[in-house]
Every structure is written in structure tokens, then in C-alpha cells.
Amino acid sequence: VIGEDSTESYSIESELLKNGINITRLNGPRMFNLFSYFSMYSQFRNEKFDVIHSHQPRSDFMVYRINKYLSKKSKWIVSVHGKYDTYLEKGSLSNNLRKYFMKRLSKHWQSAFSIIAISEEVKSWIENLNHELNVVVIPYWIDIKNSGTIVKKDRVTLGFLGRLNVNKGIEDLIDALNSDELKSLDFKLMIAGSGTDEYLEKLRNMIEKDNIENVNFLGYIENREEFFNNIDIFVFPSFSEGLGLVLLEAMSFSKICITRNILPMTNYIDEDSGYLFDDVNGLSHSIASSIQDLENNIE
């Protein structure tokens, strides 16, 4: 059962259908709506699922509430994909509400059959929320057959891939491109991923205001292999991640990687295997250094 209607969920749906797995989509309003609860309750009651596996806080909350009222209780498995209350928001009120909600949700997780974290970092975060929870770590995986080689192109191409929101640090990346250190270098930036129209407009306005050229927004992409084959350097300026799977993907394609100097990214990248930065100036310098290293080492 796939709930929220989005480009990403349709991609997941197509993969499941290829493997002969039937899909029921529960379209409708989000969590705090009686229609959503009624639709999900009816589906759970009629199908009598042995296992229910939820993947997002909204889904966790709904499954917890509905499963309490089912005559046949399903085994509920929770997968936690990030440190949800650490993501950046516009104001302190929203931050406080998020923290309150996560603390409350962590108590509901106590009724789950199993709780899965995608990294040790996320496991520690969960246990700090509620020390009574027993958490198992099952990391994401990548297909190492994607491993590629670095080849010289006419122009150095930087790339970012991920959901476009404040937490991903795209604004820092745009600010870095406007630095004097990078103005004399010849490169382009490809930004792949979806975001709200409002936030995309904000990013485009930043680029236009600073007269930055050669930045392309690709939107959501299905073919990640093609994206990685078309870039030379992967920039991942996110402020908070549960694992940073896309960083591992970039590494599997032998791309030079630049990422913020925070956990869990520093579990995979150090000064010998990539570039770490702390602020916008550090990001500018890392981009300049990586471009120079790329040009010096590829014939």
C-alpha cells in the first residue's frame, strides 16, 4: 500500500509492479483528516495484513492509531530514515512542534514489533528520544556494479541530487558559486530533484540576483545512472542526514565528492577520499580545489 501521491512514490510503485507485487494506492488528504483514517482503516480491516511496515512519521502515527482498533492486530514494523526533528524549519515554533511530535511518536513506537534505523547515527538519535526502544540497524545498500571511471569532458560538471528544501543546503551551494574564487573557473552545475514551486522560485531568484550562469534544474529524474555519468563532481551540502545514500551512490560511480563536515557523511568521506567543508567559504574552496585536482589528474 502506497499512500502519499508524489513523483517519488510513483517510481517506487513501478519497481514493485515489475516484480509482480500488487499495489493499492490510498489517495486522499494527509494525516489529520478523517477521510485518510477511514480509507486506511477499511483497507487494513478488509485485507487483514500480517505485517504493516511504515516509513514516515505521518504513516507511523496513523498506523499506531488504526492498529489499536483492529480485531486482528498486525505486526507493525517501523523504519526510521532520518533524524526527523533535526531538519531545518523557518521558525522556532515549527521546530518546537516537530520536537514535541517526535517525542510523542517515540512513545507510540514502543508498541511496534520492530524498529529499524538506517544508520548508527539514526539509532543513537532514536534512543535519545526514548531509551526504552530496541532499535535494529539495517543500512541502505547500493549496487556496486555501477562503479564507473573518471573521464575528461569538455567542461567540468558539478551535480547535486536530492529533494530540494532548506535542509539540503542548496542555498549555501548557490552562495558558494558567487565567490571570487570560483568566478574565473569554467564549470556548470546540474541540480536534480523535486521541491515546492515556492522554494524553486527562491533558488532561481538567488541565481538571477547573483548573475550566476550555467545552472540547470533537471527536476525529478528516473535515470540516476545517466545523471552520475554526466557529472564529474558531486556536491552534497546537506545540514542533516540519516545516512546520505546518494553520497554512497556518487562514490560508487567514482565521482569526486564534496560534503559537509558532519556525521554520518564523515563516516564515508575524509580528506583522503574527498572534500569536507564547514561553511560557505569552505565549500567554495573545496569546489575550486576539486576542479583543479580533476583537471590536473585527467589527461
What residues fall within each predicted segment?
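Aromatic "clamp/platform" in nucleotide-sugar-dependent glycosyltransferases that forms part
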Residues: 220, 239
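Conserved acidic donor-binding segment of nucleotide-sugar-dependent glycosyltransferases
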Residues: 271-282, 290-298
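Carbohydrate-associated surface elements
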Residues: 121, 141
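Membrane-proximal helix-turn-helix segments that form the acceptor-binding/catalytic region
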Residues: 41, 96-114
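Short hydrophobic beta-strand element within catalytic cores of glycosyltransferases
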Residues: 2, 256-259
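Short His-centered aromatic/hydrophobic patch
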Residues: 54-60, 80
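Nucleotide-activated donor-binding/catalytic signature segment of Leloir-type glycosyltransferases, i.e.
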Residues: 202-219
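A conserved mid-protein helix/loop that constitutes part of the nucleotide-sugar donor-binding site
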Residues: 156, 160-179, 198-202
